[in-house]
Amino acid sequence: MSSPIVLIFGAGANIGYNVAKEFVASGYKAVLTSRKAPTEPDASFSYVQGDLSDPKSVTDTFSQVRKQFGEPSVVVYNGNSKWHSNKEIAAAVSFTAKEDPFVVDLPTFEKDLNINTTSTFVAIKEALASFAALPETASRTFIYTGNAMNFLPFGGAMTLGAGKSASAHMIAAAAAAYAPKGYKFYYPDERQPDGRLGGRGISGEAHAKIYKKLSEDKTQGPWLQTFVKGTGYVSFPADTDVSVAH
């Protein structure tokens, strides 16, 4: 019997790597995608190149994965891992002065939106096709790496917040529509214990643990999976202050 497949878009050194490692330890074949081939590939994983700034490449990625490995039963959309102040951010963001977020030009906004949202739309559609081809015993789970920016604007990161907000809506819509089919859609959002934005201290290992748990659940849970490292899922009140300032 062949191993189930987890397809991870955005194979960064923090979340992407730890999620892949967690699933491989549970018997999955992990297929990681990134714009450039890794300089030091891990022999435990398989790799496919793809550029999330071009939504059409997502379709090509799924085609390659199906041809080489089979239908993915878990799809993790971790965006395009960039680096800022030596920390991984699981998305595309073009920073601006907080006093002038709309200084961003249209091509830059479109590029970031493609990575954060438009390619997510394509990935969801392709995942639905894969899930329909899999048996009911398969996980059939789609996970989008989120954060608290769909609740509050954070100065200087408007393109990221716009993408996260739109993608959160798509995940909520998919979770509601496809739960009767046994498909699951989640927007995990790591928080500090007081409910504030996880920020640059997010834990790849904590993400990996909750992603694996969500893949194992038999039915759709809350699409918004706010969680705290070492605790797991926490349902914060709607009026929780998510800002990073104290």
Swiss-Prot record:
Pathway: Secondary metabolite biosynthesis. It comes from the Eukaryota. The keyword Transmembrane helix does not apply. SUPFAM superfamilies: NAD(P)-binding Rossmann-fold domains. Its EC number is 1.1.1.-. The active site is at K164. Belongs to the short-chain dehydrogenases/reductases (SDR) family. This is Short chain dehydrogenase/reductase dmxR12.
